[in-house]
């Protein structure tokens, strides 16, 4: 049943994104987990009903952009407001084929600079209600890891 539902939603997403009327559409609860070491959480931290302790709960909509989410995180973590702070976003989702979670990096933003991923939305990255968002925050005085995609998951 869940597989059928996911296929139907993927077919719907092939159409151009329709703007969401935030006055009439109920927001979703986005569970966000952050690190300040530039690396995403390990997938085993999400196992057996457990989640990392660094959780933010944000009410938002599927058309929320990475830049908008960056601003909300900076409200909670003043040290992340420094110009040059790097935010790397990943969706953490339940793997339907085998037990456990998987991660999909979706983009990055930087405090004080415009970037190509700023206008990327949750909806455009196939975020599903119930997925988590993991944000690896790198302070400006440290370079972000060369590529988190090289890490085996």
From Swiss-Prot:
GO cellular component, alphabetical, reads:
ASAP complex; cytoplasm; histone deacetylase complex; nuclear speck; nucleoplasm; transcription regulator complex
Q: Which UniProt keywords are listed?
A: Acetylation, Cytoplasm, Isopeptide bond, mRNA processing, mRNA splicing, Nucleus, Repressor, Transcription, Transcription regulation, Ubl conjugation
Region feature Disordered, mapped onto this chain: 1-20
GO MF terms here are: transcription corepressor activity
Q: Name one Pfam family in it.
A: SAP18
Q: What is this protein called?
A: Histone deacetylase complex subunit SAP18
Q: Which PANTHER family match?
A: HISTONE DEACETYLASE COMPLEX SUBUNIT SAP18, SAP18
BP terms from Gene Ontology: mRNA processing; negative regulation of mRNA splicing, via spliceosome; positive regulation of apoptotic process; regulation of alternative mRNA splicing, via spliceosome; regulation of DNA-templated transcription; RNA splicing
Family assignment from sequence similarity: Belongs to the SAP18 family.
Cross-linked residues, Glycyl lysine isopeptide (Lys-Gly) (interchain with G-Cter in SUMO2): 13
List-wise, which residues carry N-acetylalanine?
2
Annotated stretches, region: Involved in splicing regulation activity: 93-153
State the InterPro entries in the record.
Answer: Hist_deAcase_cplx_SAP18 (IPR017250), SAP18 (IPR010516), SAP18_sf (IPR042534)
Which Cys pairs does UniProt list as disulfide-bonded?
none
Source domain of life is Eukaryota
Q: How does it assemble?
A: Found in a mRNA splicing-dependent exon junction complex (EJC). Component of the heterotrimeric ASAP (apoptosis- and splicing-associated protein) and PSAP complexes consisting of RNPS1, SAP18 and either ACIN1 or PNN, respectively; the ASAP and PSAP complexes probably are formed mutually exclusive. For the ASAP complex, the association of SAP18 seems to require a preformed RNPS1:ACIN1 complex. Forms a complex with SIN3A and HDAC1. Interacts with SUFU.
- Where can this protein be found? Nucleus; Cytoplasm; Nucleus speckle
């Amino acid at each position: 049943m869940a597989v059928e539902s996911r296929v139907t939603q993927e077919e719907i997403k092939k159409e151009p994104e329709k703007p969401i009327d935030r006055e009439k559409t109920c927001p979703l609860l986005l569970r966000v987990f952050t690190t300040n070491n530039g690396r995403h959480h390990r997938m085993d931290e999400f196992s057996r009903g457990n989640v990392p302790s660094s959780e933010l709960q944000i009410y938002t909509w599927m058309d929320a952009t990475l830049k908008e989410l960056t601003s909300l995180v900076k409200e909670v973590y003043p040290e992340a407001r420094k110009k040059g702070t790097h935010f790397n976003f990943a969706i953490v989702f339940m793997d339907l084929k085998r037990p456990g979670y998987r991660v999909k990096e979706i983009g990055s933003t930087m405090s004080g600079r415009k970037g190509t991923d700023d206008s990327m939305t949750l909806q455009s990255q196939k975020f599903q209600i119930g997925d988590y968002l993991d944000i690896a925050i790198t302070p400006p005085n440290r370079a972000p890891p060369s590529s988190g995609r090289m890490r085996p998951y």
